[in-house]
UniProtKB/Swiss-Prot annotation:
SUPFAM superfamilies xref list: Zn-binding ribosomal proteins
Native organism: Magnetococcus marinus (strain ATCC BAA-1437 / JCM 17883 / MC-1)
Gene that specifies this protein: rpmF
GO biological process per UniProt: translation
Name of the featured protein: Large ribosomal subunit protein bL32
Keywords for this protein: Ribonucleoprotein, Ribosomal protein
Length: 59
């Protein structure tokens, strides 16, 4: 089994982990109500997806 020959410095480990940051989610606007929403999901405000009402929202 492989074992590290030398201790990794903090800067080496942190610079390697710099790519693991959580990215902000992409937001698009709903084509029906223009509210921000996640792409490829039903709009949480109006219930529309792909140009049609998928979930009826009671007001």
């Amino acid at each position: 089994m492989a074992v590290p020959k030398k201790k990794s410095s903090k800067s080496k480990g942190r610079s390697r982990a710099a790519h693991h940051a959580i990215k902000a989610p992409n937001l698009t606007s709903c084509s029906n109500c223009q509210e921000p929403m996640m792409p490829h999901r039903v709009c949480p405000k109006c219930g529309w997806y792909d140009g049609r009402e998928v979930v009826s929202m009671e007001e």
